[in-house]
């Protein structure tokens, strides 16, 4: 399950901006941080959720596949289940996060690894399983080789179908959302076009609009999960039925049997108390596009919070 962090130490007087925290990767052993010992929770289940910027169904892979046209992942989340305390955490990752991206040519030959926005990694692939596997590898490496146990990628066509299948999704808005003519504080049930615009829209002439969209995505995802959870209480096969409604727009390495098992497990989890996180950092303007740079110290603290348990 990957390698685990070596010791990281930070004394009381250090500022979080200093670079003298040794970078860690997953290995057997405990982590010393700010005077406490932490142990990686090996029982965590972590799944990568990708939202792919395409209205088309998942493409078939054949001899004509162009491995430069896998499609960008506009939404990137980790969904984690902690069986020790029955909590769910969702970690949002900014699409513009600058990290090592493996480039391939149209015939799927490896070209080189470059620093670029995380969202493009899915594009260097077949738009199917290979794209997902490459995105999963890149996200794992960004988070110090964090073990990821499965992936689900959803194209925009899946969003329409799933949103309608659950009867629309009710959200409360923390800020004005002009694209659906709603203001801060409103509680609305999103159907059809409104759900699409709510999730997809961002102002291209407004700096850092991707992070505002990410906040909307987090609100929607939490509300959607809650509704699915309520329906699953009444019908344990509900998540599998949802998957089947939208399966031509979804790529996943989670089998139907595994979905059923996870659904039954989740009934014992605290769905009201889902913890929402974002990989910390800041957006700056690059030469052409916005670039999001991770704050490594805050990232470590978040990883310890979600994936580790204090042992002293």
Each predicted region: which residue ranges?
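Non-catalytic, solvent-exposed segments at the cell envelope interface
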Residues: 1-312
């Amino acid at each position: 399950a990957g390698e685990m962090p070596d010791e990281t130490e930070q004394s009381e007087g250090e500022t979080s901006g200093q670079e003298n925290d040794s970078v860690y990767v997953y290995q057997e052993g405990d982590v010393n941080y700010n005077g406490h010992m932490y142990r990686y929770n090996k029982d965590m289940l972590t799944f990568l959720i990708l939202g792919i910027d395409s209205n088309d169904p998942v493409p078939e892979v054949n001899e004509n596949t162009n491995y430069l046209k896998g499609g960008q992942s506009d939404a990137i989340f980790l969904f984690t289940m902690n069986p020790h305390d029955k909590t769910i955490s969702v970690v949002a990752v900014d699409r513009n996060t600058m990290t090592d991206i493996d480039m391939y040519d149209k015939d799927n030959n490896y070209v080189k690894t470059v620093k670029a926005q995380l969202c493009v990694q899915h594009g260097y692939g077949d738009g199917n399983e290979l794209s997902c596997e490459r995105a999963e590898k890149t996200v794992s490496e960004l988070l110090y080789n964090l073990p990821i146990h499965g992936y689900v990628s959803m194209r925009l066509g899946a969003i329409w179908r799933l949103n309608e299948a659950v009867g629309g999704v009710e959200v409360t808005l923390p800020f004005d959302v002009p694209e659906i003519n709603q203001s801060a504080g409103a509680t609305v049930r999103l159907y059809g076009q409104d759900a699409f615009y709510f999730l997809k829209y961002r102002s291209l002439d407004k700096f850092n609009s991707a992070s505002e969209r990410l906040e909307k995505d987090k609100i929607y995802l939490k509300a959607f999960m809650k509704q699915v959870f309520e329906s699953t209480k009444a019908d344990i096969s509900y998540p599998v039925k949802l998957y089947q409604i939208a399966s031509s727009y979804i790529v996943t390495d989670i089998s139907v049997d595994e979905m059923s098992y996870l659904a039954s497990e989740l009934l014992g989890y605290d769905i009201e108390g889902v913890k929402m996180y974002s990989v910390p950092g800041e957006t700056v303007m690059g030469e052409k596009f916005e670039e999001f740079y991770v704050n490594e110290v805050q990232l470590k603290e978040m990883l310890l919070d979600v994936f580790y348990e204090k042992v002293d």
